[in-house]
Amino acid sequence: MLDPTYPLFPTFAFLGFVLALVPLPWHLQAWNSGTCFFMVWTALGCLNQFVNSIVWKDNAINSAPIWCEISIRITMGLSVGLPASSLCIIRRLYHIAKVRAVSHTRAEKMRVIIIDALICVLFPLVYIAMQYIVQGHRFNILENVGCYPAVFNTPVTYVVSYIWPVLIGMVSATYSVLALIEFNRHRLQFSQFLHSNSTLSVSRYLRLMALAMTEMCCTVPLGIFVIVLNCTSTPIEPWVSLKATHYWYSRVDQYPAVVWRSSHLVVVCNELTRWLAPVSAMLFFAYFGFAQEARRNYAAAWAWACRALGLPERIATLPTTKSKGPGFAEKFAAKAKGLSSFNVKDFTSEFSSKAHDFTSKAKQYTLPRPMPQTPSSSGFSSSESTRFGSSVDGKELPSPTTKEFSSPIPIHLSGMQTLVSFDSNKDLPSPPAYDVEAQYGPYNIDNRVSYHIADAGVRASYPMGVAYSSDSEHRRINPHATFTSANNDTDEPTSPALPDTPSSCSSSATFSTLQSRDFIVLPSTTDVTRDTGSLPIRRSPAGPPRLPSLSQLFGISSMRAEGRDVEAQVQDVATGTAAPTTTAPAPASTTIAPATTTATAPTTTANIQRGEPDVPTSPRTHRASV
């Protein structure tokens, strides 16, 4: 009788055998014993089923009795080996969720491996040996399936054979519930604990939990189904003695497919049993075969193979950029069509013509690099809002970034240098980066205090729109304030220098001319001069990042102080005696620009909400060569 699952089943069985062993080397290096035992049992099950489906295709002849003796014992061990491996994984995750120290010394690691080996190896071997008690004869051969254990259906069989996969699954389920409870109870300590462990991350923890729970959801229902099927499909014989059970033990029963496929329940039971190993292998590879550590090892293996064969290493490192699509300049120009006062061509012509496209070789860039020199004749300025303490609009300032965020990668597009940071990519270098600096500039035509951007750089990969320094004074530049071109040759006196303090400046319809959706600006202690020179380098402070509220980035219009003279406010800030003031929306500033710069359209909350899409939440900072 033709096998409806051929050649699909042998193909999946062989793929499962290969894929289950692919992640084994780096899991061995990480001493993940429970996961390694899971891979070994899955690979053995797939190999066993692959051989059986090939050798006994369309026949039930006893052509390989020795292999059948080995095959049925692999099947017996697999029925408890997979649940036992899942139990070890869940047990380890439970101890981690309780924020217990993961073993670090060699003796502690060996102790954990020995315990897992007792559960995943010794217990299945004992289980296999116990099957001799209820084994009625050597084995059965099913056409298109292969060798199958022959178990005598007695009450002892349920205690010795059928009940153990279900019991192990129940214990795993208990550990799963306890692990979830502890995970919810100790979330903060749990996160800090995983960050201190180099071999386990939050992503790997969740994937291990998902794998163990998925396997548990497969084996427990299957074990219950086997028990119900054996209780209802065949009569339960009374237990007499071991000698009576082993009467004519040497025989081999052979069943053509037309016989065993005549019962629908038997077909379902046999197919579920033999598909268990390939499905487990596919699930395991889906959880771990595409993770970051897996891709890194694939790249290393490819490089090793190329060196061994004398071939050029085409893929030596992981790709850090996606396939090239529409450029940023084209997207930006399309978005700027609605701004009648903005000319993309005029704006981009003001930038250096030395820009190049580094998109395809971003990984070759290493910080620090020299800061660009800025002409003193023009710059960008912004309205200043009221002085505030440690919060913005009632929201606590987010903390500075940590080493979890990589150093920026330079990309030159249409004369604009943009720095893009990739979230939590530890492969990238992380030397000190440049801060964004701004100098205190002259008054503009609206008699408002402004900052003159002398130079621009990147401090580090911050969440959107906030920068920090070690000074306790907090000031900010309004998000959505109108940025115009300022002339340094004005005869108006400059205000005193401000301390180097945190400020934030998000993009608006006009500030988008900097091609920056989350620009960072810091007031500088340096006075405005014609030759600004290079800016100093400072290390970024450490601390966990946290995103600001969207209202800080998109919902704030330009503000203007009322009831006090602007110059008096500046003096108060310099002396540290400034008092809180009431702010109100400020009118759009009038452009003071060279002939090449056009007037800037007023920015309102409505325009921003209509014109700008949501900013991605990945931390990014940008750098503009002004």
Curated annotation (Swiss-Prot):
GO molecular function: mating-type alpha-factor pheromone receptor activity
Principal subcellular localization: membrane
Keyword field contains Transmembrane helix: yes
Keyword Aminoacyl-tRNA synthetase carried by entry: no
One cellular-component annotation, GO: plasma membrane
Cell compartment(s), UniProt: Membrane
Alphabetized UniProt keyword annotations: G-protein coupled receptor, Membrane, Pheromone response, Receptor, Transducer, Transmembrane, Transmembrane helix
Entry's transmembrane regions: 8-28, 36-56, 70-90, 113-133, 163-183, 208-228, 271-291
Entry-linked Pfam families: STE3 (PF02076)
Gene Ontology BP annotations: pheromone-dependent signal transduction involved in conjugation with cellular fusion
Membrane topology: Multi-pass membrane protein
Biased composition (Low complexity): 376-391, 574-606
Region Disordered: start-end pairs: 363-409, 481-509, 524-549, 571-626
Domain of life of the native organism: Eukaryota
Job of this protein: Receptor for the BAP3 pheromone, a prenylated mating factor.
PANTHER family linked to this entry: PHEROMONE A FACTOR RECEPTOR
Family of the protein in this entry: Belongs to the G-protein coupled receptor 4 family.
Protein's name according to its UniProt entry: Pheromone B alpha 3 receptor
Taxonomic lineage: Eukaryota, Fungi, Dikarya, Basidiomycota, Agaricomycotina
